[in-house]
Amino acid sequence: PFLKAYEFIKNEDIHDSQKTPPFVIIGSGLAAIEVSYALRKRWRNRRIKLFCHQKKINNKILKSLRNSHIELVDNLDFDYGKIILCTGNTSPLWVERKLLDFDSNGRFITNQNLKLKNCSGIFATGDCAVIESAKRPASGIFAVKVLNTLVKNLKKDIEGQSLKKWSPQRFGLQIVNLFPARNPMSFAIYNDFVFGPSFLIWFFKNRIDRNFIKQFHLKKGKMPKKG
């Protein structure tokens, strides 16, 4: 999916002109906001419109979006080009057919061991799941932090051992990069508080992101052979 999405964006590079119909991002969450900033950084001339509920977005961020020449709209009553949806996820149809427990946002309900409530042997984490006793919004922060517990519990489940419980923190610190006028900057969001934009926040996020990506780099000679 990522490669197809990346090719889709690359193919739009030739349309970086004010004469081209605007590119539209749909969504009011941080994903839609960060995608809008990233595309503005990539396309300096093309018109970009964010179709969103402005009341759901902090005023500091709204001002920054406008300063980055990202137009905020609440309808699509204009000629536009391509669209990207950043509207969150929903449960697939087979979930409803199997009568599995999920919340109003379409996320699987699990116990603290990360197992589905009424389906033995199946684990769920990340944006597709929520712990019944510790409900948190979908966020990459929780999705990353739960991984160690998930791996350990998969192993323990196979070996017939007692599973480990996981309790997410109450709030997660979220950092959003924005389109820089001169130096790169970011907002930091914690609960209802928004800090920045600041270069120091961007530096902090950049360091975290780079260290995270390094974990996925394979050393030379470690690539699996085809066939």
Residue ranges and their predicted role:
Residues 1-41, 70-73:
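Glycine-rich dinucleotide-binding loop and its adjacent helix/turn
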Residues 1-17, 78-145:
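FAD-site-proximal beta/loop scaffold in flavoenzymes
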Residues 28, 51-53, 127, 180:
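Cofactor-binding loop segments of dinucleotide-utilizing enzymes, especially the Rossmann-like FAD-
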Residues 60-63, 82-86, 221:
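Active-site-lining helix/loop region of Rossmann-like oxidoreductase modules
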Residues 128-179:
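A conserved FAD-binding loop/helix module that cradles the flavin
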Residues 179-227:
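C-terminal auxiliary extensions adjacent to catalytic cores
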